[in-house]
Amino acid sequence: MSLRNALPQRAEVEANALFVTSSFIAIYVFACPTVQRGGEPRSLTWFPVLRGIPALVHGNWSQIATALAPSLRNAPPCESRTSLPPLPQLWHLCEGVNDPAEKGLYLEATQMLEMAWNVHRKASEEFWVAAAFLWPVKVSDGFLRLLMEHRPRALVLLAHYGAMFSKLESFWWIGTRAREELEIIEKIVGEDWKRVWLSWVRNVVEGQASMQMGESTGGS
Protein backbone atom coordinates (compact mmCIF):
# COMPACT_ATOMS: atom_id res chain seq x y z
CA MET A 1 0.00 0.00 0.00
CA SER A 2 1.41 3.40 -0.98
CA LEU A 3 1.60 6.21 1.55
CA ARG A 4 -0.91 8.21 -0.47
CA ASN A 5 -3.42 5.36 -0.36
CA ALA A 6 -2.75 4.76 3.32
CA LEU A 7 -3.41 8.31 4.47
CA PRO A 8 -7.24 8.14 4.36
CA GLN A 9 -7.08 5.01 6.53
CA ARG A 10 -4.13 6.08 8.66
CA ALA A 11 -5.99 5.16 11.86
CA GLU A 12 -5.76 1.55 10.67
CA VAL A 13 -2.14 1.73 9.51
CA GLU A 14 0.67 0.65 11.84
CA ALA A 15 1.99 3.89 13.33
CA ASN A 16 5.67 2.95 13.21
CA ALA A 17 5.48 2.11 9.51
CA LEU A 18 3.70 5.38 8.77
CA PHE A 19 6.26 7.36 10.77
CA VAL A 20 9.27 5.69 9.14
CA THR A 21 7.85 6.01 5.63
CA SER A 22 6.94 9.67 6.01
CA SER A 23 10.33 10.38 7.60
CA PHE A 24 12.16 8.77 4.69
CA ILE A 25 10.13 10.90 2.30
CA ALA A 26 11.10 14.02 4.25
CA ILE A 27 14.78 13.01 4.14
CA TYR A 28 14.51 12.36 0.41
CA VAL A 29 13.00 15.79 -0.21
CA PHE A 30 15.71 17.29 2.03
CA ALA A 31 18.54 15.56 0.18
CA CYS A 32 17.38 15.33 -3.42
CA PRO A 33 18.92 18.06 -5.61
CA THR A 34 16.15 17.71 -8.19
CA VAL A 35 13.66 19.47 -5.91
CA GLN A 36 15.79 22.60 -5.65
CA ARG A 37 14.14 25.70 -7.10
CA GLY A 38 16.54 28.29 -8.44
CA GLY A 39 17.20 31.24 -6.18
CA GLU A 40 15.12 29.92 -3.30
CA PRO A 41 16.28 28.19 -0.10
CA ARG A 42 15.66 24.47 -0.32
CA SER A 43 14.30 24.62 3.21
CA LEU A 44 11.11 26.07 1.77
CA THR A 45 10.61 22.77 -0.05
CA TRP A 46 11.18 20.33 2.79
CA PHE A 47 9.80 22.35 5.73
CA PRO A 48 6.15 21.65 4.76
CA VAL A 49 6.89 17.94 4.31
CA LEU A 50 8.58 17.67 7.69
CA ARG A 51 5.81 19.63 9.39
CA GLY A 52 3.27 17.13 8.10
CA ILE A 53 4.76 14.17 9.97
CA PRO A 54 3.42 15.05 13.46
CA ALA A 55 -0.08 15.38 12.01
CA LEU A 56 0.17 11.95 10.40
CA VAL A 57 1.14 10.16 13.60
CA HIS A 58 -0.80 12.29 16.07
CA GLY A 59 -1.81 10.24 19.10
CA ASN A 60 0.77 7.50 18.48
CA TRP A 61 3.98 9.09 19.77
CA SER A 62 4.29 6.83 22.82
CA GLN A 63 3.99 3.74 20.65
CA ILE A 64 6.55 5.06 18.17
CA ALA A 65 9.00 6.06 20.91
CA THR A 66 8.76 2.65 22.55
CA ALA A 67 9.11 0.60 19.39
CA LEU A 68 11.71 2.65 17.52
CA ALA A 69 13.87 3.96 20.36
CA PRO A 70 16.33 1.00 20.35
CA SER A 71 17.00 1.43 16.62
CA LEU A 72 17.37 5.18 16.88
CA ARG A 73 20.12 4.83 19.47
CA ASN A 74 22.60 3.63 16.83
CA ALA A 75 24.04 6.85 15.41
CA PRO A 76 27.11 7.26 13.15
CA PRO A 77 30.00 9.34 14.47
CA CYS A 78 29.77 13.10 13.97
CA GLU A 79 31.40 16.25 15.24
CA SER A 80 31.34 16.95 18.95
CA ARG A 81 28.29 18.87 20.13
CA THR A 82 30.59 21.35 21.84
CA SER A 83 31.73 22.55 18.40
CA LEU A 84 28.39 24.34 17.97
CA PRO A 85 28.67 27.77 19.61
CA PRO A 86 25.88 29.43 21.58
CA LEU A 87 23.29 31.24 19.51
CA PRO A 88 23.68 35.04 19.55
CA GLN A 89 20.89 37.27 20.80
CA LEU A 90 18.40 37.85 17.99
CA TRP A 91 15.62 39.75 19.75
CA HIS A 92 16.70 43.06 18.21
CA LEU A 93 15.80 41.61 14.84
CA CYS A 94 12.16 42.51 15.59
CA GLU A 95 12.90 46.22 15.98
CA GLY A 96 11.19 48.27 13.31
CA VAL A 97 8.29 45.86 12.79
CA ASN A 98 5.15 47.97 13.17
CA ASP A 99 2.54 45.24 12.77
CA PRO A 100 2.02 43.66 16.24
CA ALA A 101 0.86 40.36 14.75
CA GLU A 102 3.88 40.08 12.46
CA LYS A 103 6.22 41.09 15.28
CA GLY A 104 4.69 38.37 17.43
CA LEU A 105 5.45 35.79 14.74
CA TYR A 106 9.11 36.83 14.68
CA LEU A 107 9.38 36.82 18.46
CA GLU A 108 7.81 33.39 18.73
CA ALA A 109 10.05 31.99 15.99
CA THR A 110 13.09 33.48 17.73
CA GLN A 111 12.08 31.90 21.02
CA MET A 112 11.56 28.54 19.32
CA LEU A 113 14.94 28.85 17.61
CA GLU A 114 16.70 29.48 20.92
CA MET A 115 14.93 26.48 22.44
CA ALA A 116 15.74 24.22 19.48
CA TRP A 117 19.36 25.40 19.39
CA ASN A 118 19.86 24.61 23.07
CA VAL A 119 18.15 21.23 22.74
CA HIS A 120 20.42 20.41 19.81
CA ARG A 121 23.57 21.40 21.71
CA LYS A 122 22.59 19.34 24.78
CA ALA A 123 21.06 16.32 23.03
CA SER A 124 22.62 12.94 23.62
CA GLU A 125 24.60 11.57 20.67
CA GLU A 126 21.90 9.23 19.42
CA PHE A 127 19.35 12.03 19.13
CA TRP A 128 21.64 14.86 18.02
CA VAL A 129 20.65 14.65 14.35
CA ALA A 130 16.94 14.34 15.10
CA ALA A 131 17.15 17.39 17.37
CA ALA A 132 18.37 19.46 14.41
CA PHE A 133 14.92 19.16 12.86
CA LEU A 134 12.98 20.46 15.86
CA TRP A 135 12.64 24.13 14.86
CA PRO A 136 10.78 23.60 11.56
CA VAL A 137 7.97 21.71 13.30
CA LYS A 138 7.73 24.25 16.13
CA VAL A 139 7.36 27.47 14.17
CA SER A 140 3.86 28.71 13.35
CA ASP A 141 2.08 28.58 10.01
CA GLY A 142 2.18 32.38 10.05
CA PHE A 143 5.96 32.41 10.28
CA LEU A 144 6.19 29.82 7.51
CA ARG A 145 4.17 32.21 5.35
CA LEU A 146 6.71 34.97 6.06
CA LEU A 147 9.46 32.60 4.96
CA MET A 148 7.64 31.79 1.74
CA GLU A 149 7.33 35.54 1.10
CA HIS A 150 11.11 35.93 1.53
CA ARG A 151 10.77 38.44 4.36
CA PRO A 152 14.36 39.38 5.35
CA ARG A 153 13.85 38.89 9.09
CA ALA A 154 12.38 35.44 8.55
CA LEU A 155 15.26 34.50 6.26
CA VAL A 156 17.79 35.74 8.83
CA LEU A 157 16.29 33.35 11.38
CA LEU A 158 16.34 30.58 8.78
CA ALA A 159 20.03 31.23 8.12
CA HIS A 160 20.85 30.98 11.81
CA TYR A 161 18.90 27.75 12.04
CA GLY A 162 20.74 26.39 9.01
CA ALA A 163 24.08 26.90 10.76
CA MET A 164 23.30 23.75 12.76
CA PHE A 165 23.85 21.66 9.65
CA SER A 166 27.44 22.86 9.28
CA LYS A 167 28.24 20.47 12.13
CA LEU A 168 26.47 17.56 10.42
CA GLU A 169 28.33 17.57 7.12
CA SER A 170 29.52 13.99 7.64
CA PHE A 171 26.03 12.74 6.80
CA TRP A 172 25.83 12.18 3.04
CA TRP A 173 22.29 13.55 2.80
CA ILE A 174 23.29 16.79 4.56
CA GLY A 175 26.75 17.55 3.22
CA THR A 176 27.36 21.23 2.48
CA ARG A 177 23.72 22.22 2.89
CA ALA A 178 24.47 24.95 5.46
CA ARG A 179 26.83 26.77 3.12
CA GLU A 180 24.52 26.42 0.11
CA GLU A 181 21.48 27.75 1.98
CA LEU A 182 23.42 30.67 3.42
CA GLU A 183 24.66 31.75 0.01
CA ILE A 184 21.11 31.77 -1.35
CA ILE A 185 19.79 33.72 1.63
CA GLU A 186 22.62 36.26 1.39
CA LYS A 187 21.67 36.97 -2.22
CA ILE A 188 17.99 37.40 -1.37
CA VAL A 189 18.35 39.74 1.63
CA GLY A 190 21.09 41.94 0.17
CA GLU A 191 24.31 43.45 1.48
CA ASP A 192 22.91 45.45 4.41
CA TRP A 193 21.13 42.52 6.00
CA LYS A 194 24.07 40.27 5.19
CA ARG A 195 26.56 42.60 6.87
CA VAL A 196 24.53 43.25 10.02
CA TRP A 197 22.88 39.89 10.63
CA LEU A 198 24.64 37.10 8.75
CA SER A 199 28.33 37.55 9.56
CA TRP A 200 28.06 35.27 12.60
CA VAL A 201 26.33 32.60 10.53
CA ARG A 202 29.07 32.80 7.91
CA ASN A 203 31.70 32.34 10.62
CA VAL A 204 29.92 29.25 11.98
CA VAL A 205 29.57 27.73 8.53
CA GLU A 206 33.25 28.36 7.82
CA GLY A 207 34.28 27.01 11.22
CA GLN A 208 35.51 30.35 12.56
CA ALA A 209 32.84 31.18 15.15
CA SER A 210 33.90 31.84 18.71
CA MET A 211 32.45 29.80 21.53
CA GLN A 212 31.54 33.10 23.20
CA MET A 213 28.02 34.48 22.91
CA GLY A 214 27.68 36.60 19.78
CA GLU A 215 27.13 40.31 20.21
CA SER A 216 23.67 41.72 19.66
CA THR A 217 23.37 43.92 16.61
CA GLY A 218 20.69 46.28 15.51
CA GLY A 219 19.13 46.39 12.09
CA SER A 220 16.29 47.89 10.16
Regions found by a protein language model. Name each.
Residues 1-38, 160-167:
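Hydrophobic/aromatic-rich effector regions of fungal transcription factors
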Residues 42-220:
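C-terminal effector modules of eukaryotic transcription factors
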